[in-house]
């Protein structure tokens, strides 16, 4: 699967190995990727640059991904959110989707499924 446009995907995760692997995967198919481990820096960047897609972890020490998602809606309402987390909790999944997440993936998801989710979020009308 190849990214047809140069949409920007921002990653937010407190685990450097997840950031590196996810960035490498998205880079390999042509996405423009920005990676963050700090939720505040991520939100400041999103407010200034309005990324097309944000891939957000739920469990982070500074701020939960659900709180980040809520704040992101205020500063960059057009950014589509994908949750990528280790926490497979149906109530958290429901909250994220109800708050507007385009997709919810558990870490370890098949690369092709994750990439399809990012593509669908980047091109919601297709």
Language-model regions, residue ranges each:
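Short amphipathic alpha-helix used as the core "switch/output" element in two-component signaling
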Residues: 44, 66-78
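Active-site beta3 strand of CheY-like receiver
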Residues: 49-55
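Short hydrophobic/Thr-rich beta-strand motif most characteristic of the beta2 strand and flanking loop
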Residues: 30-37, 45
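Non-catalytic signal-transmission and effector/linker regions of two-component phosphorelay proteins
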Residues: 1-10, 16-23, 112-126
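Alpha4 helix (beta4-alpha4-beta5 surface) of REC/receiver domains from two-component response regulators
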Residues: 67, 88-103, 109-112, 116
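Acidic catalytic/metal-coordinating carboxylates
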Residues: 37-38, 64-67
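Receiver (REC) domain active-site loop signature in two-component systems and cognate sites
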Residues: 60-61
């Amino acid at each position: 699967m190849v990214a047809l446009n140069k949409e920007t995907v921002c990653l937010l995760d407190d685990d450097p190995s997840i950031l590196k692997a996810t960035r490498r995967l998205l880079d390999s198919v042509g996405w423009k990727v920005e990676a963050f481990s700090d939720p505040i820096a991520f939100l400041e960047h999103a407010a200034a640059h309005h990324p097309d897609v944000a891939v957000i972890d739920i469990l982070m020490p500074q701020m939960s991904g659900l709180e980040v998602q809520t704040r992101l809606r205020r500063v960059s309402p057009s950014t589509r959110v994908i949750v990528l987390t280790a926490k497979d909790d149906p109530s958290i999944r429901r909250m994220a989707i109800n708050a507007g997440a385009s997709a919810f993936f558990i870490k370890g998801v098949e690369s092709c499924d994750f990439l399809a989710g990012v593509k669908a979020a980047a091109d919601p009308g297709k």
